[in-house]
Amino acid sequence: MDVRAQGMAAAAAAPSHSYAIPADSLSNVLAEFAARAGVALSFDPAMLDGLRSSGLQGEFSVAQGFGRILAGTGFEVERRANGYAVKRSPQASVSELETVIVQGEHRPQDEVYRTAASVSYLSRDDIERFRGTSIGDIFQGTPGVLVGENRNSGGLDVNIRGMQGQSRVPVLVDGARQETTVYRGYSGVSSRSYVDPDLIGGIEISKGPVNGVGGVGATGGVVAMRTINADDIIRDGKDWGIRVRGSTSGNSSAAPAPGTAGGVQNTGKFHDNCAVPSVCGGQFAMPDSHRTESAFDRPALLDPYSYAASIAGAWRIESLDLVAAYSKRRQGTYYAGKHGPTPELTYAKESEPFLDKVTIGYQGATRFYGGEQVINSNSNSDSQLLKGKLRLPADQQVELSYLRYHSEYGELMPSQLLWFDKIRQTSNSEVTAQTATARYEWDPADSSLIHLKTGVWYTHTDSVNRNYSDELGQAVQEKDPEKERYKRFGADLSNESQFTFLGEHRLNYGGSYQREDIGLVKPGVEALYASGRSGYRHETSLFVDWNWQPAPEWNLNAGLRYQRARGHDNKRMVARHTEICTSVGADGRCEGGKVSVPPEQCGWTGPCDHPQYYDVRTSGTSPIFSVSWEPWMNGLQFYARHAEAYRMPSLFESTRGWSAAPLQDVALKPEHAINREVGMNLLTEGVLASNDRLAAKLAYFRNHTKNYLTRTFPNTWEDSGEDFVMRNVESVKVRGMEATLDYDAGWVYTRLSGTRYNFVEVCQIGGSNRIHECTDYGLATSYFNDMIPPKWHASLQLGTRLFEGKLDVGARVTLMGKRNQVPRFNNDTARGFVQPVQWHAYQLVDVYASYRFSDAFSVDFNIDNLTDQYYLDPLSLGLVPAPGRTARLGVTMNF
């Protein structure tokens, strides 16, 4: 799957560690590195006599470390059964021997700063260092990337530069898609993908449209995760390995019993000081309490309840690699921080002759008090991974994998958090996601025209959502939850050819296919009238991507993608005698008159000779162009990029059910993203010290998405009978800047990153239910309202490596701005149910320390939210505060 820089995947395959080896003779540096890496190394000291090395600073795998130390020396290492041996490079020359240190083996972190596009990479160490409480916390600090509804689910809903949901930002796990759409009441929907962070080996993030088999429909970008493999587990020089990892964290406790109330309670209108006591009784009696006292029994900082444990084993038997892993995770209900916009009770008294009328309310970011247990933030999950890779003769290999994720978690409808007087702990929701992949690769060493990759994958997700409190009434409590089943199948084929003619050329071409099916686990007739969805969708895509390097300093890229899709709703579309329009004008009004659907053709109930179903077919062709220029060949690169992508209507958007439905006479069109970007990359060494590394990335982007698909109100002339309608609106525009600065001198390192949005606009032209054609804060009842990113967000990380790199200590500061505010008057979103969730600006401090006793044993300690801030995450659908100060202790052992 080619959705990132060439070579990044190979560089990401092996685990890395931090090293701080000072300058010395080449023999001593090699010996020191081998000792710290825990591998055997043999060489003839006389062969290296007189050669020096500037040492090794930073994070490297064993192969990368040897490559960096020996780069330009005319020597290389050869892997043998009992370790490594130094030998002369076959093509070494005298001039090469005179230069000791030059650019070494590419690391995935370095590829970010060589790519003529906005990309990011999260290594295994990054994921471990900033694990957080929720899965989405691993993306905190990544420029341009946020996670929607991070505290009210067990899944990932990634937002890249304002694009989110419905496969705008697909999350790929070993190349497979598993995204599902979950009903969130009047507040809309949430797209979710599920994976355990202990089983992730690395994450590559591409921002904006990309070519390749993995980029179909990705108008926002692609998040490509790879699961752990044998190289992550097996130490160098061995043919088997076992990794055991365990961690425990505080600031949490067992979930309370279902029905337990939380947050500010008993608000409303009451009577006091009544001349007639009975008037102050019943529903008008002044409440004795406004909170659940047991919810404030917060554990001490080092009093753990939550835990995560995993074990992974790998075996290498000649040409066969096998991996098996199991992970178990328990997250209790966490406690909110104490410092910030916590709620405070408000009292308004109106005195009358015989009584006082008292109105009790609250002011604050959410209903939860500072330091309170946040109900429904609990989860329990377990995951299993089986993986095998077989290296065949003639440079071929086959890889099979199976991943299963099961979670039981608490959550609440955002509408309950917003509107009801009491919020309560509910019974757990459940999800089981299974992913199977099979991949084949042929890369013959004697042919540069063939690098063939093909694969098939299948995902199966079963979910049960139990997220209604008893405030909604006994009838809802007794109703069985609807069990939803979601299945996806995909296949892809691609080949890369390289040749030389007026420069270097790389041609990548191929195609992909996927089919999706959604349905309810109910009998056939009953399922047709349930609120869930039932339908199928399939999509085919062909692409070609050409890269030409006419001179060392120039690189040109051009690509083209064609795709077509069909979505079909299994539910009947209209009832008897429904009138449908025969012709619709450009403004959405009916111009051709209406005809009545004959009774014998369709009906929601009873027999039907010719039922009417919603069926949408779409297609499109989109180009990508880019050019990069490295004028002085010193690591400074300038680039410009124009990238387009089509996203065909999703299965959710093409079918009837809860939240919204398409209309028979309102055709859905594909979204069309047109993104332009100019930027600069810098990757150099020896800036302030002989062995330091400086990397920087700067980008300005202008993203324009035409025919944006979202939920709206029906127009007044549309006799749809629907409360909410799925349709294309005019456009969404997002513009801004993004910057990253990364400096590593070995003993000290720092990383700064930030994103600034200077223009956000969503337009609906021609609709009857609007005040303004365009706004910067949202549209009435649109899902986009809670996908608008903050005006800015940034992070600063500073760390040091001590005791020869064994101790790594540091801190990260996260700064989050506000989103665009809704106006006090003439608010377009006030008439809808999806009113933008406003969060306050906040600053967080996280600290971490890691000590590696040996290559086989390490200990990590983190404190997240050191200053115990009370805050609401951006892009929240419901008012759920984030965790307060949380300590975490982890241990990793490798055998």
Per-region residue spans from a language model:
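Extracytoplasmic beta-strand/coil segments of soluble accessory domains associated
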Residues: 87-89, 136, 140-177, 207-208
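Face-selective signature of the C-terminal outer-membrane beta-barrel domain
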Residues: 391-405, 431-597, 603, 612, ...
